[in-house]
Amino acid sequence: MLISNLMSPKSASGALVAMLLVCGSVDAKAQPSPYHEPPERHVFDGVTDDLLTAGLGVTGLTQQPGIAEPSKLSEWRDRRRRAIWQSWRALVDLRRWAYGSEARIAGVEYVAHVKASERLPESSFLLQIPASFDPNKPCLLVTAASGSRGIFGSLPTVGQWGLRQGCAVVSDDKGLGMRVTDPTGGWRLTASGHIEPIARAASPFPHALQMAHAHASFESEPHWGRLLLRAGKLALQLLAAEYPERAAFTAENTLIIAAGISNGGAAVLQALEADDAQFIDAAVASEPNVHLAGAPALYDYATLHAMLQPCAILAENLTEAPLGIVVGMNLARHTAWCERLAQDGLVSGSDVTSRASDARQRLLQSGIEPAALRLGAVNLQFGLWTSVAATYAQTYLRRGLNEPACGISFTATDAGGQPRELQVSERAALFSDGTGIAPTAGINIVARDAAGGLSNANASSYDTARCLRSLSTDISNLTQSLIVRGRTGQRPVIVLHGGGDALIPIAHTSRRYASLATARNPKFRFLEIANGQHFDAFLAIPGMEPAFVPMQPFVDRSLDDVQAFLTEGKALPASGILR
C-alpha cells in the first residue's frame, strides 16, 4: 500500500512531522525552510510496494514493469517504479542477485528538493527508513547517485546494503538528474518529474534541450561532497520528525557511513575532505571519479580516448574482445579514422596496422591499462567518450544553449537526424528512463559544423572528436577546484577500483589517491580488483566473462568490513590486489 503525505502509524508524531517538514526546524523563526516545498512522505507496506524494488521484487526487476500507458507516468508511484526498475537494470548484474527471496523492504520514504544557497546549488535527495530501523541504535548511510543520475541512482549499488542492515539511507542527486528544459517548446521537467509549462523563447537552435549536468547555472561538481553532507544533516532532522519520542538524532549518537560508486564515490571522498566536524564515521568509495594534482582529469582522458580509440581498437584481438564483432562490421570507418589521425600527425605508421598499433601504444603510455583497452569496442558501441566529453565541455566552459561548445546540442531527432520536439509520451518517461547525460531517453547528441549542417554525434565523428579534444587544455585549467588531496581524517575508509576499469582509469585516480591517503590515515585501505571493470551490467555482454568479474560483491563486503570495525572492533582487511 502506498500512502502519500500522511502521518506515520505513530500518530502522536504526525503534527510534529508536518511542522518540521514545513519549517526545517522546530523553531520556524530561527531557521527558514531549506526546501522548495515540504518533503513528500510515503509509506510502503513491503508487499504491494516497497523501498528496494518498488513492489516488483526480484522477479519483477528482471521483467518489463506493467506500465503500458505513458499517461500513467504522471503519477508518482508509476514514475518511481519505472525509475527504480531502470536503475537496477543499468547498474548491477541481476543474474547474480544474492539478497534473498524477493527482497521487498517495508518502510517510510521522503523525497526532498533543497533550495540553492550562496555556497551550494539546489539538489534533491531521497531518504528511506526501513521498518527494521532501530531508533535506539540508529545508523544512517549517506550516498550520492552515480554518474549524472537522479535520486534513485545509488539504490541498487550501496542503498540496498544500508536498507538490508536496517539503516536509514539518504541519497543526493548532486543537483543533476533529469532536470530538462525546452525553451523553444515551452516546457520543463522538474526534479520530481512533473512537466511544467514555461514561456517560449526564440533560439537559433530549435528544440535544443537544457540539461542540468551540462547547463546548470551553478556548477555542482566542486560541491558534490558538501551536497552529500547537507543531505545527511537534513536526513537527521527528518529522522527526528519521524521519531519525536526519542532524543534528537545527531552525528554523535548515530552511526553514519558514507558510500558511493563512480561520481558518487567522488562525492564521498570530497565529503571526507570537507567534513571538519567528523560527521561521517566511515566510508567506502568504489571506482571514484576523482581528480588528483598532476594527473589528467576525466575530460582529458575521455577526449584522448575519443580521438585515438576508434583507430586503436583495430590493434586488439577482435575475435576475443567483447563486441569486437561490431568493429569488424565497420572496418571501413575505423580504417578511415586511422587515416585522418595520420594526416593530422597524431599517429605514425604507413598502413592501418601500424597506425592502430601506434594509437594503442599512445593510450598505454598515457596510463591506460591493457585490460581497459580490451573493452574499447564496448566503449565505442555505447558512445561513451562522446557522451562524457559533450556534456562536460558545456559544464566546464559554462556554455549556454545558444553558444554550444563544438556546435553540440542535446535534442530529440527525427528519422532524418533533424531536431524535433519530444512528444508528450516521451516527456512523460524522461524522469524514469533518463540517466541525466545524453544520449538518453530519446535525447540525442547532435553537432553542427561551420556551415550549419547537422550530424548525429551519439557515436561521434572525427571532426567532433577533434574539436572536443582541442578544448582539453583550457578545460584542464578549469578543473583545479576539483582536486582532492587524500585527506580522509582518522576514520576507516576503503577505496576499491577495478584494474580493468575502462571509464575511470585506476592509475590516474584511485592508485594516486591511495598513495596520499595511506600516508595520512592508518585506517585507510585500498583494494584493487584485478579483473574488475566499471559497469557490472555490462557483464551480460558476450565475451565479458570470465575475463571480468562483478564489483558489487566487493562493495558489499567492504561495507560489511567498515561496519564490523565500528560496531564489533574487527580488523579491517589489508590493502592489496584481489584476483
Kindly give the residue locations of the regions a language model identified.
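Bacterial N-terminal signal peptides
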Residues: 14-24
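Bacterial N-terminal signal peptides that target proteins for export
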Residues: 2-15
